[in-house]
């Protein structure tokens, strides 16, 4: 198997050709149910019912789980859809055609078990199906958008978020919390120095002294250990959508892909995106020193993604039938002799004879 490669074809068909345990992480955003027509046969999201849509994606992610290393994770972005009256559901403002979600394509808007105007609950239908299929459902991350697309509805709040589900192949998996840690609030250090007295909720995390006040340990009010300046990343991520002029309806924000990759894919590892679209996951992987495997059904998007990867954030595109695109050499057994997927992060730093901070962080990332 070769890394740094885009396969142009059906996701399930291509995935079946990939070897077991060959990628470290999957970051992807499949086409949402009944929201877009991407103009190619065999596209996902045009199924007659949500149940068929979920069934189709479950079979694809079953193959994703097979090709993941035992400590691999899946970062799955998905949004919901509303049931309609038999012709279509609710739509966004048609004046804004390049949003992450958009005008609903008319299928059969009636959904079994749902009334007209009901929120279908597609993200959770899919999440529960994946859990039942063997995935560990670890987190429901809310992607909050300060610049959401306008909606024409007047009888409910406008949507400003999507889901990112973190799922793992095994109970123990790679997650680099340090790589995505976020700054604590400015008021936190001062409150910690004041201690656990009336009106304060902070106490020192010192073995054997569960309720010891922080300000009891040093005269200046600091604890014996340094007051942390970073905290574990929360599960609400504020990331704005960014218009992409390359002709793809639903470009993934670079920052969103970056966060998932830093947390879920070790340096030198391989990330998979079976719904590559305009190539955001692959482009970010290359920038961060990771390898990528991309799969995309639409030949035009295959070419667009390759141009974007090679030119950074290049917006030009040459629309032509695409075969298989590749960059550089492969992973194992190739002329450049890259380590096998899943081994790169384990072997980093070996032979140097020292316990470096980088190595310690890598070890800590394995839960």
Q: What function would you assign to each model-found segment?
A:
Residues 328:
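Acidic, PIN/NYN-like endoribonuclease modules and their adjacent C-terminal/linker elements
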């Amino acid at each position: 198997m070769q890394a740094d490669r885009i396969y142009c074809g059906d996701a399930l068909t291509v995935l079946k050709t990939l070897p077991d345990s060959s990628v470290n992480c999957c970051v992807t955003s499949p086409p949402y149910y009944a929201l877009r027509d991407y103009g190619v046969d065999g596209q996902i999201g045009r199924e007659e019912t949500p149940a068929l849509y979920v069934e189709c994606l479950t079979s694809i992610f079953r193959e994703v789980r097979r090709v993941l290393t035992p400590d691999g994770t899946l970062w799955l972005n998905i949004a919901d859809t509303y049931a309609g009256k038999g012709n279509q559901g609710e739509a966004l403002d048609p004046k804004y055609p390049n949003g992450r979600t958009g005008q609903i394509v008319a299928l059969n808007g009636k959904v079994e078990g749902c009334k007209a105007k009901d929120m279908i609950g597609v993200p959770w239908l899919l999440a529960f199906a994946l859990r039942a299929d063997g995935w560990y459902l670890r987190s429901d991350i809310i992607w909050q958008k300060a610049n959401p697309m306008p909606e024409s509805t007047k009888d409910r709040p406008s949507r400003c978020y999507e889901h990112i589900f973190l799922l793992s192949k095994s109970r123990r998996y790679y997650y680099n919390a340090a790589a995505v840690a976020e700054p604590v609030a400015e008021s936190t250090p001062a409150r910690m120095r004041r201690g656990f007295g009336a009106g304060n909720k902070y106490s020192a995390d010192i073995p054997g002294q569960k309720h010891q006040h922080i300000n009891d340990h040093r005269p200046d009010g600091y604890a014996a250990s340094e007051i942390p300046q970073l905290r574990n990343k929360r599960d609400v991520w504020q990331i704005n959508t960014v218009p992409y002029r390359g002709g793809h309806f639903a470009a993934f924000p670079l920052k969103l892909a970056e966060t998932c990759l830093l947390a879920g894919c070790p340096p030198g590892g391989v990330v998979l995106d079976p719904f590559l679209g305009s190539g955001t996951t692959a482009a970010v992987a290359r920038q961060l020193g990771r390898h990528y495997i991309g799969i995309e059904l639409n030949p035009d998007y295959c070419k667009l993604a390759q141009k974007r990867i090679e030119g950074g954030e290049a917006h030009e595109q040459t629309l032509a039938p695409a075969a298989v695109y590749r960059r550089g050499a492969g992973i194992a057994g190739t002329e450049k002799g890259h380590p096998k997927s899943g081994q790169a992060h384990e072997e980093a730093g070996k032979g140097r004879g020292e316990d470096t901070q980088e190595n310690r962080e890598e070890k800590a990332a394995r839960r």
